[in-house]
């Protein structure tokens, strides 16, 4: 067989959210605000659930780790994206791109699994309240969180090298604001059947397992709520579940749209807009949806703002 005649790609150029020069500064300001709000909200949740004695049950333990994951997911993407708004040559090295994809996969898969863990936690809390602290013990909490991170890490070290094992030898322009799977595979000059198959199987397995756990948990939660005799209690419980389900639906809907479709059907410009939701918008909204409507968190936040030392003294 004749030897291949090509120049291997050593760096990529990111097109960003928009290629319009007039929009770079306005977009920089918009996404800077989103990132700052994401940082503030999630760091606030991490701080409150770490130092306040009222927020030391399993629900807030899992919420703290969701905030850590959201913070990591945004930080893997946002700083590079913000920098690229301000420079003309939006380049990223081959290894920097691989590292970013690996970090993104670690956090996004960990978030998928953490949502399933949190759904199970809420199921036990509502359906078996008397046994809640026995079933969801400290040991189980640590085990579930450890498995969540381990699964995210194992997915990242399998999928990311697989994506970068194909040949990139023609265009090096990634039609995206970060190194994502679909735009990278679109640049490959070799057969992408194996990495596409691995990505599809991995995404399908992760999402289906997590979604089944979430749906079964919330189905039983709804049945339990319907048995509540007090109209006010039922209304409050439904309102709380609706908030969580909105966040879960937006997240899973975006992920299904992104990854469970054939590569040939991808519209990369549409994918960029969808990616904004689960890399920046959802991590920004999660602290509000999951906790700021919660009375315990509101009380803890008020006490912390009045006297930051109060929470430490009350532990």
UniProtKB/Swiss-Prot annotation:
This is Olfactory receptor 8J3. Residues 1-25, 76-99, 161-197, 259-271 are extracellular. It comes from the Eukaryota. Belongs to the G-protein coupled receptor 1 family. Pfam families: 7tm_4. The gene is OR8J3. Its main location: membrane. Glycans are attached at residues 5, 265. It is found in: Cell membrane.
